[in-house]
A protein has these predicted regions:
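N-terminal targeting leaders that direct proteins to extracytoplasmic destinations
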Residues: 1-18
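Periplasmic peptidoglycan-binding/anchoring modules of Gram-negative envelope and division proteins
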Residues: 4-6, 28-63, 90-91, 120, ...
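Residues at or immediately flanking beta-strands
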Residues: 11, 18-20, 58-60, 98-100, ...
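Short secondary-structure boundary/capping segments
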Residues: 11-12, 19, 51, 117
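Short low-complexity stretches enriched in small and charged residues
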Residues: 15-18, 55-56, 80-85
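Short, aliphatic-rich beta-strand segments
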Residues: 19-24, 28-30
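Residue-level preference for alpha-helix termini and adjacent loops
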Residues: 26-28, 35, 76, 109
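Periplasmic OmpA-like peptidoglycan-binding domain that tethers envelope proteins to the cell wall
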Residues: 64-138
Length: 147
């Protein structure tokens, strides 16, 4: 709920025991750029504020592109964008040891790249939030105690 309330330009989805915070690339970056837009740092600061309240989570920041350009260029661009997001989260107080960057390039599209709308959907950064091993262990122990 805190994510939905505080991170207004992202969509939030639950997938099993993790949450996915999805930012459209246009919100964070100019076309074919890795430097964050000024407004993006505000959005990421809001995300960092929530993440600091949940230190027992691990975070994978994933960059994604559409299929425009070469696959090698898109992979590098997506990796650099994921790193840019991590740098801001760390500067806003999120522990670096919790963060991993992954650049998928055009390998994991949400929609077909054959339309402009599909390509827009595919250009994105996702922050996957999952419980760390200690939290998973504590949850398993609590589940055993209550059964």
């Amino acid at each position: 709920e805190a994510l939905k309330r505080d991170v207004k330009t992202a969509t939030i989805e639950r997938e099993g025991d993790k949450l996915i915070v999805r930012f459209k690339s246009a919100i964070l970056f100019d076309v074919d750029k890795t430097a964050l837009k000024d407004d993006a740092t505000t959005e990421l600061a809001d995300l960092a504020r929530v993440l600091k309240d949940y230190p027992d989570t691990v975070l994978v920041v994933e960059g994604h592109t559409d299929s425009s350009g070469s696959a090698a260029h898109n992979k590098k661009l997506s990796e650099q964008r994921a790193q840019s997001v991590i740098q801001v989260l760390v500067s806003d107080g999120v522990d670096r040891s919790r963060l991993t960057a992954k650049g998928w390039g055009e390998d994991k599209p949400l929609q077909s790249n054959s339309t402009a709308e599909g390509r827009t959907q595919n250009r994105r950064v996702e922050v996957h939030i999952a419980p760390n091993q200690e939290l998973k262990k504590a949850d398993a122990e609590n589940a055993q105690k209550s059964s």
